[in-house]
Amino acid sequence: MYDYIKGILTKITAKYIVVETQGVGYILQVANPYAYSGQVQQEVTVYTHQVIREDAHLLYGFATENEKSVFLSLISVSGIGPTTALAIIAVDDNDGLVRAIEQKNITYLTKFPKIGKKTAQQMILDLEGKFVMSEEAGPVQQVAPSSENIALEEAMEAMEALGYRPAELKKIKKFFEGTNDTAENYIKSALKMLMK
């Protein structure tokens, strides 16, 4: 098991980041890879959780220990796997998640991808009163305007990797057309829109 990996961020994709340390590049699946956009070729510390399956050894990465703690709580719920837990964390509304669990708000919880009514009920049953979280906001980064909105395309690709359907993403993309922001901010805004 690894608690964290400290090294140079060398690559960002829609599903994962690569952190190189001691000549080894570790693939870390993270909730929002583009949150690391401004840190390419810089030293980063990513908190990790390793999942060993019959067909794969996977590392999941988190920006903070709090994010990792939420992930571990979520995957302890029957019916929630690592991919779904990452999608929930990607919304970046920890207070809203806690509030929904404490208030038994099934409607809010079922807005997450792959969370149905039964899984939402199980989340409430297993997690009610278990954790208190506070929102942690990252720095806002602006990008230079361009004719092609690559950041929006990257954001939509990352959202699809989190399990959102193309039909949902088409509406979101249309809403953001003509705007200019970072992929990270597009993802945060889109996730908040989908949770309404």
UniProtKB/Swiss-Prot annotation:
Swiss-Prot/TrEMBL keywords: Cytoplasm, DNA damage, DNA recombination, DNA repair, DNA-binding
Subcellular location: Cytoplasm
UniProt feature coiled coil, ranges: none
Entries under SMART domains matching the protein: HhH1
InterPro entries: DNA_helicase_Holl-junc_RuvA_I, Hlx-hairpin-Hlx_DNA-bd_motif, NA-bd_OB-fold, RuvA, RuvA_2-like, RuvA_C, RuvA_C_sf
SUPFAM superfamilies referenced in this protein's UniProt entry, alphabetically: DNA helicase RuvA subunit, C-terminal domain, Nucleic acid-binding proteins, RuvA domain 2-like
GO BP terms, alphabetized: DNA recombination; DNA repair
Keyword Hydrolase belongs to the record: no
Gene Ontology cellular-component annotations: cytoplasm; Holliday junction helicase complex; Holliday junction resolvase complex
Region of interest called Flexible linker, as start-end residue ranges on this chain: 142-146
Gene3D superfamilies: 5' to 3' exonuclease, C-terminal subdomain, DNA helicase RuvA subunit, C-terminal domain, Nucleic acid-binding proteins
Stretches for region Domain III: 147-196
Pfam families, per the entry: HHH_5, RuvA_C, RuvA_N
GO molecular function: ATP binding; four-way junction DNA binding; four-way junction helicase activity
Subunit description: Homotetramer. Forms an RuvA(8)-RuvB(12)-Holliday junction (HJ) complex. HJ DNA is sandwiched between 2 RuvA tetramers; dsDNA enters through RuvA and exits via RuvB. An RuvB hexamer assembles on each DNA strand where it exits the tetramer. Each RuvB hexamer is contacted by two RuvA subunits (via domain III) on 2 adjacent RuvB subunits; this complex drives branch migration. In the full resolvosome a probable DNA-RuvA(4)-RuvB(12)-RuvC(2) complex forms which resolves the HJ.
NCBIfam families with a match to the protein in the record: ruvA
Entry's free-text remark on domains: Has three domains with a flexible linker between the domains II and III and assumes an 'L' shape. Domain III is highly mobile and contacts RuvB.
Family: Belongs to the RuvA family.
Name of this chain's protein: Holliday junction branch migration complex subunit RuvA
Organism in which the protein naturally occurs: Streptococcus suis (strain 05ZYH33)
